Amino acid sequence: IMSSYPTSCNFTHNAWISDDNNYLFTTDEQAGCYIGSYDVSDIYDIQEIDLIQEWTGDGSMGLQEDVIPHNTHVFGDYLVTSYYTSGVTIIDASDPFNLIEVAYYDTSPMSGGNFDGCWGAYPYLPSGLVLATDQQEGLFILHTPYGNYEGLGCTDANACNYDAGANTEN
């Protein structure tokens, strides 16, 4: 072993490296866990730099502790992630230190912290469409309007990674 680093819930199911090989994105496949972003540019000094959890919390009674990430894939500046009963999320990872969910589609009418629902989301078609497979509902073909998050939607510094002094340019 050259190096190791624990993930947020210590139950990593998958990992995907960024196109520049500097960042690793992981999913911990347990209820209430996260997609993690890690700086692996120096494998002897791995750093956790951000965690994100599917925000809709459409698990049982809307509880965040019921969301379970399954697999994430890097597609350019985005992470496309299957989330069991919460469907598919698209995360802007152009800044791996500040992961922002920009889109989601719930494939499953089911709820709760179980392993039903969306098992996979494949973003690599030449058309840009995403294929999502749901164990109970079947195949979904999703059009995803990829677009960068500009930091304009969050205004509560206590609720998000928001810098009130930051400037954005169009």
Regions found by a protein language model. Give the residues of each.
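Primarily marks secretory-pathway-exposed extracellular/lumenal segments that are disulfide-
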Residues: 134-136, 145-170
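Feature marking well-ordered beta-strand scaffolds used for ligand recognition
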Residues: 1-151
